[in-house]
Swiss-Prot record:
Pfam families: Ribosomal_S16. The keyword NAD does not apply. This is Small ribosomal subunit protein bS16. The keyword Ribonucleoprotein applies.
């Protein structure tokens, strides 16, 4: 199964994270399929940069985000776009 999760980068005591698409059997910092953005929790306010189109595409393909990534993607507005796409597909099927 393909997951969307965080991989840790940065120095000791100064983490930042990449949001990546990875096979769930891989290590946390192992090889990944694609990078979707990054998250820096140390900055005030935190920095969140997500390629929304790529994230939507992977979610529609069936990639499961981890709970933390799900919260971050919700803040970035990814799930609103996913819902809109699903609604338009249902409307097209009904007509």
């Amino acid at each position: 199964m393909v997951r969307i999760r965080l991989t840790r980068m940065g120095k000791k005591k100064q983490p930042f994270y990449r949001i990546v698409v990875v096979d769930q059997r891989k290590r946390r910092d192992g090889a990944y399929i694609e990078s979707l953005g990054y998250y820096d929790p140390i900055k005030d306010p935190y920095i969140l940069n997500v390629d929304v189109d790529k994230a939507v595409d992977w979610i529609l393909k069936g990639a499961q985000p981890s709970q933390t990534v799900k919260n971050l993607l919700r803040k970035a507005g990814v799930f609103k776009k996913v819902d809109e796409i699903k609604r338009t597909k249902k409307k097209e099927e009904n007509q």
